[in-house]
Amino acid sequence: MVPAAGQLALLALGILVAVCQALENSTSPLSDSPVAAAVVSHFNKCPDSHTQYCFHGTCRFLVQEEKPACVCHSGYVGVRCEHADLLAVVAASQKKQAITALVVVSIVALAVLIITCVLIHCCQVRKHCEWCRALVCRHEKPSALLKGRTACCHSETVV
């Protein structure tokens, strides 16, 4: 005999009620202590047999699956951290290259600034320096000498 649709619906409803009652909270005491459940971790240390399991990472033992897993170091991917992550390597390389370029440019700019300050100081305050005179007086126009003015270098005046 084939049951009617109403009977099937009642049967399904009965099963659903039975499952809900089974899953419902009860006032019976817990069999395990709640502290022990909170302390249990999903990972344990890998046994000695798996110390070399991960190529570029740290080994952890999955408690539920009872097998080792790897936490890869930066720049490596794969189940056992066996593959280099090229995108991470390129990004790190570009960052290092940019920092190196910035340091080099800063050092060169600082050196140019220091040399410029020394030259200005020497040529403004101490025009009697031999190398300053050679640098400054070399570019002096003879028109200043012809008009009877004092030249940039103290030793050259027109009478």
Swiss-Prot record:
Please report which positions carry a covalently bound lipid of kind S-palmitoyl cysteine: C152, C153
Q: Which residues lie on this side of the membrane: Cytoplasmic?
A: 124-159
Please name every pair of cysteines joined by a disulfide bond in this record.
C46-C59, C54-C70, C72-C81
Signal peptide feature range? 1-23
Q: Does the keyword Transmembrane helix apply?
A: yes
Q: Which residues form the propeptide?
A: 24-38, 89-159
Could you confirm whether the keyword Phosphoprotein appears in this record? no
Keyword vocabulary terms for this entry: Cell membrane, Disulfide bond, EGF-like domain, Glycoprotein, Growth factor, Lipoprotein, Membrane, Mitogen, Palmitate, Secreted, Signal, Transmembrane, Transmembrane helix
Q: Which residues are glycosylated?
A: N25
Record topological domains on the Extracellular side:
24-97
Subunit arrangement?
A: Interacts with the PDZ domains of MAGI3, SDCBP and SNTA1. The interaction with SDCBP, is required for the targeting to the cell surface. In the endoplasmic reticulum, in its immature form (i.e. with a prosegment and lacking full N-glycosylation), interacts with CNIH. In the Golgi apparatus, may form a complex with CNIH and GORASP2. Interacts (via cytoplasmic C-terminal domain) with NKD2.
Q: What is this protein called?
A: Protransforming growth factor alpha
Protein's organism: Rattus norvegicus
| Organism ancestry | Eukaryota, Metazoa, Chordata, Craniata, Vertebrata
